[in-house]
Every structure is written in structure tokens, then in C-alpha cells.
């Protein structure tokens, strides 16, 4: 009888400890800081030499790429969005200096800033460089070079999805 009582007390103590630990873990997760990312407009350079002027299509695809990237990252629940205060088509690394973009990101409440550059090299090949910069430390914490074939909406969507997965899988900020 005495052993049974000790066993019940031990069982109760272990259950209470498990509940306390589980609550602590949940609180720790809830308090984890959310990455607040400002996505600057992406700079675009076309040196393909194509006869047809596709600049309007490229601007449209860039804005769609940026919007989809923001949406995919926010939908993950891991990243919040901060909007940069800039005039339209004047907020990329081709328009203003990185330092100015970082200042705008800080003003917007961002912890991190994503900057990017696309380069269309030929009718079929495009490459891009993306950096995520820690706003406070002013240090690159993520960088990717990507290349893709095609200059149509589907190719751009695949590139955006790939980049979003790369950012979300990075893990260390």
C-alpha cells in the first residue's frame, strides 16, 4: 500500500513537471521574434540585345514577382512584411544606395531588408542576385544567385517560388 502511494505521488509529480515544461515551450515559441522583412523593388538590366522592347513586361513581372514573394513569405507565418516608403519604380538598388534602403527599412520597422538584381543575358537566360541584410547590423545574412530559362510569366513564377523556399529554409537570421 505504501509503495502504491509513493508510485501515485511520483506519477503526479512527473505529470505536473511535464505540464510545466510543455507550457514553457509553448510560451518560448510564442515569444520568438518574427522576422520583419522589407522587400525593396528589384533592379532589372536587359543586355540581351533583343529587337523587341519588353521593358513594360519586365516592370510588370518584377512587381508581380515582388508581390508574390511578399505574399508567400508572409503566408508561411515565419515572416512579417514591412513596406518601404518610396516612390513607385524608385526603390531598388539601381535607384538609390543600399544605405538609403537600409535607412528606409529601419523607418518601416523592418529587421531585415531584401534587395535584388535581375540580369537578362540572352533571349532565354536570366540570372539574379538576392541579399537579405540585417538592418541593425547592416550585414548580409543570406545571399543567393539564381538563374532560370525563359522570359514569360511561368518562368518568373518558378523563380519566385524557388527564392521563397530558399529564404524560408534558411532558418538562421
Language-model regions, residue ranges each:
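Short, solvent-exposed, polar/charged sequence segments at loop or secondary-structure edges
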Residues: 75-115
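Short acidic, glycine/proline-rich loop/turn micro-motifs
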Residues: 48-54
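Soluble non-cytosolic domains of exported or imported proteins
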Residues: 56-67, 95, 150-158
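Bacterial N-terminal signal peptides
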Residues: 11-22
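N-terminal secretory signal peptides that target proteins for export/translocation
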Residues: 1-7
